[in-house]
Regions:
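Hydrophobic membrane-insertion alpha-helices, especially the h-region
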Residues: 9-25
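N-terminal targeting/tethering segments
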Residues: 37-164, 169
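PPIase-associated folding chaperone regions across multiple families
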Residues: 2, 20-69, 157-217
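Short, low-complexity patches enriched in S/T/P/G
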Residues: 1-7
Length: 217
């Protein structure tokens, strides 16, 4: 997936309204069964209002933005995978697409999605000996994300009061943890779960994720 397509998917699925369902942007999950509404240019023009409204209700995110401006960087995977940030993204997506999910429903989605991410990291470590290092996430962002400078991305960064660098390397950093994890895991999971006769690459890729995540149960 190209950097531009990756960011577009992130915006369309802003909060994993099923939880990447990352709401949407679930690199390590195949539960995206619900069709997501596509955002229009007009929707993006409302980004600032949508973000501002949610920030008023979630002071924790405002505090994180302030820490970013002060140069503080979360240095642990557990800190990166925040339920509050997942909930923030879901609520922004909810506002942009004019949906009417309750706060309780959106919080539950955020908790589920974040829990899946944490479990995926645990299974990768315990079953495959795979860990994700901060340096690997930084390198992934440098190669695949930082070069994307679309209008939508700039609008989002401005709505948050961040530079593109702060958005990519700090605020949205958690998005890319699972990308790095899956890149490292794929060869190992493929050895354990071979491709079936007649199975398409897409179907195989989705099945790999499903069967890997089943190990979390």
């Amino acid at each position: 997936m190209t950097g531009n397509n990756r960011f577009t998917l992130t915006m369309i699925c802003f909060g994993l309204v099923i939880a990447a369902s990352v709401l949407i942007k679930q690199s390590a999950s195949s539960e995206q069964n619900e069709p997501k509404p596509e955002l229009t240019v007009h929707d993006y023009a409302q980004m600032n209002v949508a973000v501002e409204d949610v920030l008023k209700e979630m002071p924790e995110i405002t505090e994180e933005l302030e820490r970013i401006h002060l140069g503080h960087i979360e240095d642990g995977m557990e800190e990166l995978l925040s339920v509050k940030k997942a909930e923030f993204r879901i609520r922004v997506e909810n506002n942009l697409t004019k949906q009417e999910h309750s706060t309780e429903f959106m919080r539950a989605m955020a908790e589920k999605e974040t829990g899946r991410y944490v479990d995926a990291l645990r299974v990768a470590k315990e079953e495959y000996g795979i860990r994700v290092a901060e340096e690997e996430v930084t390198e992934f962002i440098k190669k695949n994300v930082a070069n994307v400078r679309s209008k939508e991305k700039k609008n989002y960064a401005e709505a948050l009061g961040l530079t593109l660098y702060q958005l990519d390397y700090q605020f949205d950093r958690d998005f890319y943890v699972m990308d790095v994890l899956w890149e490292k895991l794929t060869p190992l999971v493929m050895e354990k779960i071979p491709k079936q006769d007649g199975e398409s690459e897409k179907a195989y890729g989705e099945r790999l994720k499903v069967e890997f995540l089943d190990q979390e149960e």
